[in-house]
Curated annotation (Swiss-Prot):
SMART domains: SCY. Potentially involved in T-cell development. Recombinant protein shows chemotactic activity on thymocytes, macrophages, THP-1 cells, and dendritics cells but is inactive on peripheral blood lymphocytes and neutrophils. Binds to CCR9. Binds to atypical chemokine receptor ACKR4 and mediates the recruitment of beta-arrestin (ARRB1/2) to ACKR4. Residues 1-22 form the signal peptide. Its main location: secreted. GO terms for biological process: antimicrobial humoral immune response mediated by antimicrobial peptide; chemokine-mediated signaling pathway; eosinophil chemotaxis; inflammatory response; positive regulation of cell migration. It is found in: Secreted. The gene is CCL25. This is C-C motif chemokine 25. InterPro entries: Chemokine_b/g/d, Chemokine_CC_CS, Chemokine_IL8-like_dom, Interleukin_8-like_sf. Residues 94-151 are annotated as: Disordered. Belongs to the intercrine beta (chemokine CC) family. It comes from Canis lupus familiaris. GO terms for cellular component: extracellular space.
Amino acid sequence: MNLWLLVCLVASLMGAWSTVHTQGVSEDCCLAYHHRARPRLLMRAQGYQRQEVSGSCNLPAVIFFFPKNKMLCVNPRVNWLPNVFKFLDNRNNTHSKQHLGSRRNLQDSHLGGQRSNTGMSRLAHSKSKSSRSTRSNKKKTSFLNMANPGP
């Protein structure tokens, strides 16, 4: 009888473990809006993504991505939000049109708009700046491609 009880206990713990383990894989989504967001702040974002209601995300939102993996959730019904979308789309399209088909558009966006017009290679340009260390070398580029993925 004790063996049967032990088997039932182990089986129930294994079932509970898989449930607890899969909860950690849930979606990253906005659960509340940031009500103090203003257009000037949002125009400094690296990109944005629209969040639709699905799964555990029960709130429609727009997620703005900033340096150092910071995010800000905004209500999509705010009346000035289309102006911010237009500004970010124009800024990101300008970078991608200048370096179409190359990986330099991600690197150049971290230079703060400084570009080499002399035709120097990226390596030569970085060697000329190696005497000073900038924070832009440490930024992550994972969110730069996320500008306007939605309709």
